[in-house]
């Protein structure tokens, strides 16, 4: 590693951690309807949205009504996007006259963007019109991120409130999350990316002739606006097929820094938002400490693995630097590793290099980041409500060990809460192991694998892990665009999204109705180093015990077979 690499890592943490506490407080004030510096500008727009939709912002909903509103909104978004993708050849803003998507691919894509997964079994510049990219995908990028934020806020209210049956109003939370929480930051990042060289145009693709006399088509489009939300909203779906490895999507070292940092900016800020909801920022610092510990462990392991020389070249008289296969030479090894760890620690899935070319242990780190449930920062809202589920599980385990009724911030965890927590523990195993096993047992789906042996198994395992974790990244050698995988991966995305959201909202409703007992000296503290350690071990054990056999068959076996 060179000095540039160390400065890159320091700059990354600075860009994320310095503004996060202030942004977290801003989100708390916004979601609770308090006045901010944006209120004079966006307040009239917000009130206009309520009048048009017939929503009274003072009316709050029970968790059941909140859930029904969320499901109805997401279903409508799915159907609209599905129709746009099917019939894009009959719609405007299609200068390349691209055909509509085949129905299983359209289903997969619509589910993918509705669930904030952004799994892409297609190449954007070769498959989608400008209208599909803007009105279809970009809109879903905003509302899927806002949905995650709304669910998190409902859970925060459930923990922070007492003796109430309401969690807020879904329509109000969605409006505020989009207007205040996402649009301003996305506007700033989009303008910055345009300055750095990312295209934002409705012009047709450019036909050029290379120096060798070969015709070449250079794709353009309204890319900057979509890239901004796909990073800040932890969506990850690229405007171009190779995502942020494309020079039009990520043209400079500065764009690379701000794009990778923006992946976890909002998830980190929302941890501080939670602290404001429960009126105890020590809880935020404990959760941030656990997230950082897991992130640094994974990052250090990945960096070490990627800087190891390839054993296949041991007997060749060449000087080996870090392997550069699948990496953008403009950015180098460290920038690629930092992105791969960040994009899988969050449920983002964007890439600036090819994960299929990572060394086995680096690929395993990416897998583990997703297998633990995308709780190491995670997606906008989704990451923190996933982490809070692990917090409650850790509190329950601590209560069992000391022989006391478990409680978190004065709320007792009883049978109903524990049952809901157990349901969430089944989401990743069902999505990854059950669906993945079905795919691995049939000859047709297995044909999508491009490599024999352990790496081929890792390709299939990565695909179903990514879908179930709502991440969206992939090992590029996996041929995902088949009817079977389009439908099965779409099912995995739905399980991974709503398998968490429904129990989380039920849990929020249950906790909101409870009284808050005063926290005394005999209460188990959830803000100190001991609890951070317990929480970290709980996350690793739950993920490790569940998925260790599959990891042994994939990346671990590949690592050993290569002779590292």
Swiss-Prot record:
Answer yes or no on keyword Transmembrane: yes
Bilayer topology: Multi-pass membrane protein
- Coiled-coil portions: none
Cell compartment(s), UniProt: Cell inner membrane
Cellular component terms per the entry's GO annotation: plasma membrane
Predominant cellular place of this UniProt entry's protein = membrane
Keyword annotations of the record: Cell inner membrane, Cell membrane, Ion transport, Membrane, Potassium, Potassium transport, Transmembrane, Transmembrane helix, Transport
Q: Which residues cross the membrane?
A: 4-24, 67-87, 135-155, 179-199, 258-278, 286-306, 382-402, 420-440, 487-507, 528-548
Q: Determine the domain of life of the protein's source.
A: Bacteria
Q: What is this protein called?
A: Potassium-transporting ATPase potassium-binding subunit
Organism this protein belongs to? Pseudomonas fluorescens (strain Pf0-1)
The coding gene here is kdpA
